[in-house]
């Protein structure tokens, strides 16, 4: 978690307890005297105070804009989807967002838009960021 934290599923499902719990956790972590962090994912790191500060800044941005949190979650979840599936036809991703509850519900509840429109925006932003690539009409995770 050197550069942030994971998806806040509670908020995505309409339970507003996740962000306050994350804040309490980060504030408690900030009080600890830590020399090295050995995370469950990623390399060990020593700049603990900076990592907690980054996580708190990200949390503040999400508290100020639940839509930003939801968009970040959609990007992360779709990236993980592609890591599992390897590739998806771009033409079918809008339908996929409409069929998968988390994508469908977040599209409608946070953005008041149809899932296909949100899918198009998520794909475009991830392509622009270099996280995804387009190959022969398919969307793939970079490096796959």
Tell where the protein language model's regions lie, with residue ranges.
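C-terminal regulatory/interaction regions
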Residues: 68-144
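Metallo-beta-lactamase
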Residues: 1-50, 54-63
